[in-house]
Amino acid sequence: MANNNSAKKRIEIAERNRLRNRTYKSSMRTLMKRCFSACDAYGSAPGEEAKASVQASLREAFSKIDKAVKVGVLHRNNGANQKSRLSSAVRKVLEPTS
């Protein structure tokens, strides 16, 4: 356990940041899973409503990833990799190769 006040304060700050980061990461993962499941649903039953659902879930996930990078929860390269994964999954479903 920390002995001086500054070390105690750093422990409190680290715990506060850990909890905040955990909520960002959790909601980001949830939105990514939602996007992947929307892609699967569109792949099994294509339609305009399913396509709109895929695009909306992609926008929400991108927004959450960008916010996580902005506040320092994720490194910008990690955020770019996550967005790339989502984009390629959506592109694969919406633009099938002929």
Curated annotation (Swiss-Prot):
Annotated SUPFAM superfamilies: Ribosomal protein S20
Domain of life: Bacteria
A GO term, aspect molecular function: structural constituent of ribosome
Keywords: Ribonucleoprotein, Ribosomal protein, RNA-binding, rRNA-binding
InterPro entries attached to this UniProt entry: Ribosomal_bS20, Ribosomal_bS20_sf
Record carries keyword Nucleus: no
One GO term describing the cellular component: cytosol
Keyword Ribonucleoprotein in annotation: yes
Alphabetized PANTHER family for the sequence: 30S RIBOSOMAL PROTEIN S20, SMALL RIBOSOMAL SUBUNIT PROTEIN BS20C
HAMAP family named in the record: Ribosomal_bS20
Protein's name in the database: Small ribosomal subunit protein bS20
Organism of derivation: Synechococcus sp. (strain CC9902)
Name of the coding gene: rpsT
